[in-house]
Amino acid sequence: MPDAFDVSDDKQLVDQQLTRDSDSKPAAKPASKQKPPSKVPGVLAADPVPEPGAAPVQAREQGHAPQGNRKPAVLEPAYHESRVVRLARYVASWTGPVNPLPAIDVLRWATNLMQSFIDARAAAGGVPVFRMHIGLPVVVITDHASAKFFLGSPSSDLDREDFKRFGPLGVAPSLLKNAMPSLVASDATGHKVDRALTVAVMHSRFKHVDEALRQSQQIVYDDFMPGVFRHPDQYTIRDVAYKFVGQFMFKWLLNTTPPSLKALRGYPVDCIIDLQTSNWLGTLVGSALCKLKMAATHSSTLNAEGLDIVRHSRLYETYRKMAETMGYTTADLDLWLQFLVQFNGVAGIGLTLASAIAVLSEQLSTLDELRREVGDEPLRFDTVDGKFPLLDSFAYEWMRFFMGPRVIFKKAMKDLQVPTSDGNLYKVRKDELICAALPLCQRDGTVYDAPNRFNARRFLDNPSLKWQVFNFGFVEAEHNPKPVQTARFGCALYSAGVGLALFKVLIGTWIQRIDWECDQEFTFVGNDTGDHGPPNGKFSVIKPRQPKH
């Protein structure tokens, strides 16, 4: 694990972040030289430009070269709609700002997120790259090679949108105001400085990770879980997961206690709901629905609860001075910190932790093996990595199957050719919006055997396969001499050296201390949508195990 960074080291960290126009790397990984610029848009550099008849660089690296010596085909992304439907869409566009189709498209997509991509891919003939309308026209990528290119490309090729949104999914304006968290910032809107501040905040608290994790788990197991044991019908699996992660995140980054469970649960749900489309009517409908949703769930009151805790943290002034030193605006810094802690942290880890608990309720043999492996000794953040092979494999399969975000959007900054696992290239034009449907990309049968099945032992049998998992948004970049992971917009929590070990300690301690059964069966086997299980799934049986520690 990386050494702890003192606050006094933050200026050096920022200088390193701002003076390099390279991909961000996890703190725990060694630095490596960057590849020289590619001469062919859409083909990562370092290797020579392919000769006629050769596979694209990415295809050769992954073993997905075209059959024989055929030259890679350069294709236009297929449409998922028939010509008749596209003609009707064109005619409807004449109505301009009152065209109802963008509103219909975005509502249909937002209520059936990943399945809409699956249906559209089938309608487009099963190709890995296709065009569709989800309130905005997008090019959707759905296989491993295209996602690897998408995640690993520099911002000169692909950059975030210039707005606080993920495609049509906008952040409610009242939740951020002038703040621009790195999760929604492009290079044009200050992503480099923001990410430097995000990582610096985490590094300044790195030496407190283990103690914060120990204290937060003790509080939850001693004070919160007895209530769950007595009244399991009053808590969902997500409630319990959010409580564990929320207790840790607020203790670690703010040295305080979290808001109520209701406030923890409500913030991520009501954050990304401001639907935005390509015309006035669709955006108006989406914004109106956002305001109604927030009013119905009392979001303003619940969010104010968390915001008050942020403002009264003893570390708030430290972070404000840190932001000033780095040249980052301190306007709405409280909202920025709340987004970092509650959305990136609590929702980002909490949702997927709930999925792991649900999976293990179905895979009892895996649960038994994990219990034998981890034993009864307390798990520590600084020693859990590399000590438990099955737990490690389970963690990578967890990331492959469930890790968010499920969709990532970027804008093409130039004309590109996107490689795919079948060796073909797909044209994307400058300014087109690309959406990576990551659950589909992580279930590419050319990379993973039985990709739609959750297999906790997958990486025991083939440890090198770990490098093909998009680990917190990171991808394998090169071998020099060991594999190195990189990502322009990868998770800052992972960059700070925290993400994977945090999950292992949380789920490892859970299986040591808890016996449980769920009130329903979860259909994760064969599920390629990346869903985290029914949001209201509960425990039918839950009780403490012995011995405790």
Swiss-Prot record:
Keywords annotated in UniProt: Fatty acid biosynthesis, Fatty acid metabolism, Iron, Lipid biosynthesis, Lipid metabolism, Lyase, Metal-binding, Mitochondrion, Oxylipin biosynthesis
A single Gene Ontology CC term: mitochondrion
Binding residues for heme: C491
Pathway terms, separated by semicolons: Lipid metabolism; oxylipin biosynthesis
Subcellular location(s) per record: Mitochondrion
Region (Disordered): 1-75, 528-549
Top-rank EC class of the record's enzyme: lyase
Catalytic reaction annotation: (13S)-hydroperoxy-(9Z,11E,15Z)-octadecatrienoate = plasmodiophorol A; (13S)-hydroperoxy-(9Z,11E,15Z)-octadecatrienoate = plasmodiophorol B
Main location: mitochondrion
GO BP term (any one): sterol metabolic process
Single GO molecular function: monooxygenase activity
PANTHER family linked to this entry: ALLENE OXIDE SYNTHASE, CHLOROPLASTIC, CYTOCHROME P450 26
Record family assignment: Belongs to the cytochrome P450 family.
Disulfide bonds: none
EC assignment: 4.2.1.-
General function of this protein: Cytochrome P450 hydroperoxide bicyclase involved in the metabolism of oxylipins natural products such as egregiachlorides, hybridalactone, ecklonialactones and related bicyclic oxylipins. Isomerizes the hydroperoxides into epoxyalcohols via epoxyallylic radical.
UniProt xrefs under InterPro entries: Cyt_P450 (IPR001128), Cyt_P450_sf (IPR036396)
Listed name of the protein: Mitochondrial hydroperoxide bicyclase CYP50918A1
Basic and acidic residues composition-biased segments: 8-26
Organism ancestry: Eukaryota, Sar, Rhizaria, Endomyxa, Phytomyxea
Cofactor section: heme
Biased composition (Low complexity): 27-41
Superkingdom to which the source organism belongs: Eukaryota
